[in-house]
C-alpha cells in the first residue's frame, strides 16, 4: 500500500489556501490555482500544513487521497516557484520565435506554424532552436510542451524534430543494400 497520503503538504508563508467543500484554491506570488478533489478525499488545513485522508464509505479512499496530495503539492510548488519545460528544435531550418503569447515555429512545412499559448503560460526563446515554457500549473505546462512536440515529433533515423531538452531519441540504422 502506498503511503503518499500520510505525508502532509507544508504550506509556506505567503501562500493562501481556501477549502470550500471539495474545491481547493491555492494563491501565491505566481498566481492562483483551483482544483476540485474526489469525494472520497477529506482535506484539513492545520498549522500551515494540508493533511489528507479517506472518507468513510469509499473503498479507494487512500488511493484518491494519495493522488490529491500529489496534485496539491504540485499546486503549492507552482504558485511559489513555478515550473519550466525546455524544448529543442533539431533539424536544418527549424526555428522558433515568440511574439506575445504566440509561438511561431518553422518546422519544414510549406507554412509557418503559430501556436497560441493558454493563459498563465509564458514562453521565451534563448536561441532560435530552444523554447522555454514557464508557468504555475504543471499539467498545463506539460500539455503545451506535448502540443508543440506533436507538430514534428523526433523521427527515428536522423532525430530531426521537436524534442524535450532531457529526451534521448533512439536512432535506427539505415536500411542496408
Swiss-Prot record:
The keyword RNA-binding applies. Signal peptide: none annotated. Keywords: Ribonucleoprotein, Ribosomal protein, RNA-binding, rRNA-binding. The keyword rRNA-binding applies. It comes from the Bacteria. GO terms for molecular function: rRNA binding; structural constituent of ribosome. It holds the Pfam family Ribosomal_L6. GO terms for biological process: cytoplasmic translation. GO terms for cellular component: cytosolic large ribosomal subunit. Part of the 50S ribosomal subunit. HAMAP family: Ribosomal_uL6_B. Belongs to the universal ribosomal protein uL6 family. This protein binds to the 23S rRNA, and is important in its secondary structure. It is located near the subunit interface in the base of the L7/L12 stalk, and near the tRNA binding site of the peptidyltransferase center. This is Large ribosomal subunit protein uL6. It comes from Salmonella arizonae (strain ATCC BAA-731 / CDC346-86 / RSK2980). The gene is rplF.
Amino acid at each position: 500500500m502506498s503511503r503518499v497520503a500520510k505525508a502532509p503538504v507544508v504550506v509556506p508563508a505567503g501562500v493562501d489556501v481556501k477549502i470550500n467543500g471539495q474545491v481547493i484554491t491555492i494563491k501565491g506570488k505566481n498566481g492562483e490555482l483551483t482544483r476540485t478533489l474526489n469525494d472520497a478525499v477529506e482535506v484539513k488545513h492545520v498549522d500551515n500544513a494540508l493533511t489528507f485522508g479517506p472518507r468513510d464509505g469509499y473503498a479507494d479512499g487512500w488511493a484518491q487521497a494519495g493522488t490529491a496530495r500529489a496534485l496539491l503539492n504540485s499546486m503549492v510548488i507552482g504558485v511559489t516557484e513555478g515550473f519550466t519545460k525546455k524544448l529543442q528544435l533539431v533539424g536544418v531550418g527549424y526555428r522558433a520565435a515568440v511574439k506575445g503569447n504566440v509561438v511561431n515555429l518553422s518546422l519544414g512545412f510549406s507554412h509557418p506554424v503559430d501556436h497560441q499559448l493558454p493563459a498563465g503560460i509564458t514562453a521565451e526563446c534563448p536561441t532560435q532552436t530552444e523554447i522555454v515554457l514557464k508557468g504555475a500549473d504543471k499539467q498545463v505546462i506539460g500539455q503545451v510542451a506535448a502540443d508543440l512536440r506533436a507538430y514534428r515529433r523526433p523521427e527515428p533515423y536522423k532525430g530531426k524534430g521537436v524534442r524535450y531538452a532531457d529526451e534521448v531519441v533512439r536512432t535506427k540504422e539505415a536500411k542496408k543494400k
